């Protein structure tokens, strides 16, 4: 079960003090490397090193900060023997990305045709 983040620990939601869940989620997902980490964990658990490699050598400090954010939000968990993986909630979130991924593929093909 995801931990509830105390109001004092939450980072400000960009441009809003509403505290609405959608704004908090968009703020979390808008942080550097958050979406990429979720995407790279879509098929399997990865160690910190493998995840860093998959994320184009992201800074270890930033990567660990994002992993901490995503763990605290309940999207990622650390399994000692295998590394980081998506939780069930993280997999649910990933499912919401798939239509956008399919659209991005169509958009890419449409905009590269000459």
Regions found by a protein language model. Name each.
Residues 1-9, 54-66:
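Membrane-interacting alpha-helical segments
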Residues 2-9, 16-21, 39, 95-114:
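Amphipathic alpha-helical dimerization/coiled-coil segments
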Residues 15-62, 73-75, 84-91:
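N-terminal helix-turn-helix DNA-binding core of bacterial DNA-binding proteins
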Residues 68-113:
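Charged, amphipathic alpha-helical coiled-coil/dimerization segments
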């Amino acid at each position: 079960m995801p931990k509830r983040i105390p109001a004092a620990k939450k980072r400000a939601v960009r441009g809003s003090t509403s505290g609405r869940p959608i704004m908090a989620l968009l703020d979390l997902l808008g942080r550097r490397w958050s979406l990429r980490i979720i995407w790279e964990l879509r098929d399997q658990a990865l160690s910190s090193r493998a995840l860093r490699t998959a994320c184009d050598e992201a800074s270890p400090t930033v990567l660990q900060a994002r992993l901490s954010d995503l763990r605290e939000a309940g999207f990622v968990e650390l399994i000692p023997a295998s590394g980081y993986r998506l939780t069930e909630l993280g997999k649910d979130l990933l499912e919401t990305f798939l239509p956008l991924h399919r659209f991005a593929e169509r958009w890419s093909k449409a905009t590269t045709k000459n």
